[in-house]
């Protein structure tokens, strides 16, 4: 049977932990590399509901985007939300792998998926962050172009459909859209960089 280590190694090949940003906490955060994993649940966050779903389907592993454990843990108790989740995972032999900024940055990761969903060709990064194991440049965010210039209202419609959302925050400057920048996650620090690139 497949082991947690096999799944971790597969995910690490797609989005190496070495790509993560310094503040982040990714990889196997709860569990045992040598435990078997017959079923896996994917989630954005490890919530109480996600843990209950994993238990109900008999999943031995949850793979989430956002880390369950972010800062230093001084204690693991049932009085604390994160502590309760960790206790529940351990009691039910459920491991947790988190792939956060490494998945955002990786080739084919979150930022590339966003560009693809919007129909844009990737031309570069908002900010270089280093090189991968093969020596290829990697970075935060993506910059690219649509196949043709379109009106702002049409671009908003594409965004709503691609992201499956009913609402967007925007400022209509009355301009057409051709070049764009995306940044998975908060991205507030990259707003100025995006203005340089587009």
Where are the regions a protein language model picked out?
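Hydrophobic structural segments
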Residues: 1-196
């Amino acid at each position: 049977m497949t082991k947690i280590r096999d799944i971790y190694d597969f995910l690490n090949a797609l989005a190496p932990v070495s790509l993560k940003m310094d503040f982040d906490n990714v990889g196997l955060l709860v569990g045992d590399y040598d435990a078997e994993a017959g079923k896996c649940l994917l989630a954005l966050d490890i919530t109480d509901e996600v843990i209950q779903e994993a238990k109900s389907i008999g999943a031995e592993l949850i793979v989430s985007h956002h880390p369950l454990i972010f800062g230093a843990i001084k204690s693991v108790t049932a009085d604390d939300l994160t502590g309760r989740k960790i206790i529940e995972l351990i009691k039910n032999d459920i491991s947790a792998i988190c792939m956060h900024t490494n998945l955002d940055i990786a080739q084919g990761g979150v930022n590339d998926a966003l560009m693809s969903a919007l129909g844009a060709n990737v031309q570069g990064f908002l900010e270089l962050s280093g090189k991968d194991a093969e020596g290829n440049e990697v970075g935060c965010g993506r910059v690219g172009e649509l196949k043709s210039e379109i009106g702002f209202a049409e671009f908003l419609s594409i965004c709503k459909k691609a992201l499956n959302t009913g609402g967007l925050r925007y400022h209509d400057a009355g301009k057409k859209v051709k070049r764009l920048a995306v940044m998975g996650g908060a991205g507030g620090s990259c707003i100025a960089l995006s203005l340089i690139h587009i």
